[in-house]
Structure formats: C-alpha cells, structure tokens
A protein has these predicted regions:
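A short glycine-rich, hydrophobically flanked beta-strand micro-motif that places a catalytic Asp/Glu
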Residues: 58-70
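Short, flexible segments with low predicted structural confidence
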Residues: 44, 71-72
C-alpha cells in the first residue's frame, strides 16, 4: 500500500551498529530497484539498529520496511547479506565493502554519512 524502504546496515562483531543507509524504492522491475532515493530518517535507522541488536546480527544486513494502510512502517524482510541495491549506498558515499574488510582485519574504520542522492539504474539490450 505505502512507500517501501530498503536499508543497508553494517554491525561490528559485537552487534554494535556502525551505519544505516535507508533508501526509498521509487521504482522496481522484477523485484529489483531501478530508481531509489537515499534518505535520512532517524526513526527507520533506530528501528533497524534495535532489531539487528536484538537478533545479535553481525556484518552486512539488508532490511526492507513497508508502510501499511495507516502509514505505519513494518519490517517485511531481514536478510543477513548484501542486498542487490547495496551499491546504491556506495554511490552515496558509504563504502560497505571497505567497512567490512576493515572489520575483518581489525582495523579502525571510517564511516561516512551518506549523501542524500537519487539513483536510476538502466539496463541495456545486448545482441550477440
């Protein structure tokens, strides 16, 4: 019924949240985001951090939330992996791969705040 959000989250090995990058799914084709907007939403970020800590998740997590008929956000998916649109977060300035590698190598990691951008993904036909 309402707006759908995908949120990329990274947590350290103690389930402490390092970053959350929410994005509105403005258009999808066959379940894949083709238009998205990175947004700043403290409520969404807190909800994601809370559920990830409760579940003791670690590493890269991809969550999806959707507004119900009353506009209330509900979790619809929690995936312990990179999502298909995680690259959108990288385009917004948050390099998830670098953060994960730093965590694995026990290095101090720098986490940038995401740039609030819109992204459009295009597919091309290829004839061989």
């Amino acid at each position: 019924p309402g707006m759908e959000y995908t949120i990329d989250v990274v947590l350290d090995d103690q389930s402490n949240p390092l970053v959350a990058v929410p994005r509105k799914r403005l258009q999808t084709k066959e379940g894949i985001s083709t238009k998205a907007e990175i947004v700043k939403d403290d409520y969404i970020e807190k909800m994601c951090f809370d559920i990830c800590k409760f579940l003791k998740l670690k590493g890269s997590i991809c969550l999806q939330m959707k507004e119900d008929v009353n506009g209330k956000l509900k979790f619809v998916e929690i995936n312990p992996r990179f999502g298909g649109g995680t690259y959108f977060s990288t385009l917004a300035g948050v390099n998830f791969m670098e953060i994960i590698l730093d965590l694995l190598n026990k290095k101090t990691t720098k986490v940038n705040s995401p740039n609030l951008i819109k992204i459009m993904r295009y597919y091309n036909e290829v004839v061989i």
